[in-house]
Regions:
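Feature detects long, helix-prone N-terminal segments enriched in hydrophobes
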Residues: 1-126
Length: 126
């Protein structure tokens, strides 16, 4: 995104919210590394996004899938001021489990996350 992290993050959060995801966890990697190691790094955050209905169906299919919840979204700022977002692919996670019931929730999550990314793209290009 051609925006710094401080401007991109609210756009991403709103897009996730519109797609039915809540943010359960937030890690300010920059602040954590500064506090723990005394180092300065690029602006970097990790958000844990969850759609409760999808998570419930996935956990019903295989309780061990909880080790991969919530869906991780890493956002960091490049030296040129642009923000890069990297998103966990729920479809790949479902392939790691034998439970047949995981494919449908994983595909639904992937579709909703894709919709959120399209919303972000539209907001950035507007």
């Amino acid at each position: 995104m051609p925006k710094p992290l401080t401007e991109a993050e609210p756009i991403v959060r709103e897009a996730l919210k519109k797609a039915g995801f809540g943010i359960l966890t937030e890690v300010d990697v920059t602040a954590t590394l500064r506090e723990k190691l005394g180092v300065e790094t690029r602006p970097y955050k990790i958000l844990g996004a969850c759609n409760p209905g999808i998570a419930h169906r996935a956990l019903e299919a295989d309780p061990t899938v909880g080790a991969f919840l919530p869906c991780g979204l890493a956002m960091y700022e490049e030296p040129n001021g642009e923000t890069i977002a990297a998103l966990q692919n729920p479809g790949l996670i479902s392939q790691s489990f034998e439970a047949a019931g995981l494919a449908a929730p994983a595909n639904e999550a992937l579709e909703l996350l894709d919709a959120a990314l399209r919303t972000v793209a539209q907001a950035v290009l507007a």
